[in-house]
Amino acid sequence: MAKKVSKLVKLQIPAGKANPAPPVGPALGQAGVNIMGFCKEFNARTQDQAGLIIPVVITVYEDRSFTFITKTPPAAVLLKKAAGIESGSGEPNRKKVATVKRDKVREIAELKMPDLNASSVETAMLMVEGTARSMGIVIED
């Protein structure tokens, strides 16, 4: 018989830098998960993606065991890395902060495809371009 799920915990943690301090500790402590076990496993799985923020969905079962799935980094994080900026524009309609080439947007869209609700790379590109626009990043051909 399958284990019963008691809780789903969603977090965004820097790759390879999970530790028992907030936000990881309190979120997993409430669910009764072995925090150090999760941290070691997460850090081992994400050590090659250093510098990126990785969304993770942790499934906690009634016997306090857990499994987790790592997702692709948010489009905003990938766009900031591609543009070489620290943060997006506070006024994206008035003040543009950077430019990104369309081929870089395609690269990001292809990376994000498994997590996006898109049927083709072109529609995924439109989603990534929308994120860029809302951050004050201009897309160049």
UniProtKB/Swiss-Prot annotation:
The keyword Ribosomal protein applies. Transmembrane segments: none annotated. PANTHER family: 60S RIBOSOMAL PROTEIN L12 (PTHR11661), LARGE RIBOSOMAL SUBUNIT PROTEIN UL11M (PTHR11661:SF1). SMART domains: RL11 (SM00649). Belongs to the universal ribosomal protein uL11 family. Part of the ribosomal stalk of the 50S ribosomal subunit. Interacts with L10 and the large rRNA to form the base of the stalk. L10 forms an elongated spine to which L12 dimers bind in a sequential fashion forming a multimeric L10(L12)X complex. One or more lysine residues are methylated. It holds the Pfam family Ribosomal_L11. CDD domains: Ribosomal_L11 (cd00349). This is Large ribosomal subunit protein uL11. One of its GO terms (molecular function) is structural constituent of ribosome. Gene3D superfamilies: Ribosomal protein L11, C-terminal domain, Ribosomal protein L11/L12, N-terminal domain. One of its GO terms (cellular component) is cytosolic large ribosomal subunit. It comes from Exiguobacterium sp. (strain ATCC BAA-1283 / AT1b). Keywords: Methylation, Ribonucleoprotein, Ribosomal protein, RNA-binding, rRNA-binding. GO terms for biological process: translation. Forms part of the ribosomal stalk which helps the ribosome interact with GTP-bound translation factors.
